[in-house]
């Protein structure tokens, strides 16, 4: 039976960064990695971890916003896909991202998840302390596919969304608020009681190109 780990937050709330760190940690410990439908299957000490997403050109993992199942982006379709991965590969942990505005969905009730092989649910609401910090992060990350009003609305209703999940009052469930500014190895500490301070966020393609340009200019000089 599997544990469903869903990290919720607006765009640019560093969800993918934390999951990328967790993947890199597992690989540093000798985990094997297999590319499977919709993501990656990592195996360490006979425990299987499925990360739903894809990798960018710089090698960094990115989650839900990559929409690895193409048009199949509804919650029911995603959960059915997770059930398929659990059945076919014997997955023990499913790591995925979500947005604040889907957190009250009935699709996350245990009555829908348990038939898929999910017996434990861990929800983490990863957010900045203030709306201003959230909007500034999106500005710095040049997020263009999220409407500002939608971000503000979701942020203001964050506590209501959390309460909806808590009110389900179902067993084997964690609902926790996490600062987007916590260490990148937060989930390494949470699930492995370990740390991974050597993790570095991969440079973006733009940063790599700029660094190469600077190197060429220095050589010419």
Positions of PLM-derived features:
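Short beta-strand-centered segment that lines the nucleotide-binding/catalytic pocket of NTP-utilizing
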Residues: 29-43, 52
């Amino acid at each position: 039976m599997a544990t469903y780990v869903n990290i919720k937050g607006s765009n640019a709330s560093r969800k993918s960064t934390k999951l990328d760190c967790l993947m890199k940690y597992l690989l540093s410990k000798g985990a094997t990695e297999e590319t499977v439908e919709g993501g990656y299957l990592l195996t360490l000490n006979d425990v299987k971890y499925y990360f739903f997403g894809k990798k960018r050109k710089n090698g960094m993992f990115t989650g839900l916003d990559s929409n690895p199942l193409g048009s199949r982006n509804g919650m029911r379709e995603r959960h059915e896909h997770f059930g398929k991965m659990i059945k076919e590969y014997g997955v023990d942990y499913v790591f995925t991202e979500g947005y604040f505005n889907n957190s009250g969905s009935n699709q996350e009730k245990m009555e829908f998840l348990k038939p898929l092989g999910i017996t434990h649910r861990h929800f983490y609401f990863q957010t900045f302390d203030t709306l201003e910090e959230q909007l500034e992060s999106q500005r710095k990350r040049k997020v263009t596919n999220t409407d500002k009003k939608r971000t503000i609305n979701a942020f203001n209703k964050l506590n209501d969304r959390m309460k909806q999940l808590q009110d389900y009052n179902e067993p084997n469930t964690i609902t926790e608020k996490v600062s987007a500014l916590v260490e990148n190895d937060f989930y390494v500490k949470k699930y492995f009681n370990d740390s991974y301070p050597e993790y570095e966020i991969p440079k973006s393609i733009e940063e790599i190109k700029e660094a190469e340009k600077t190197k060429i200019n220095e050589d010419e000089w």
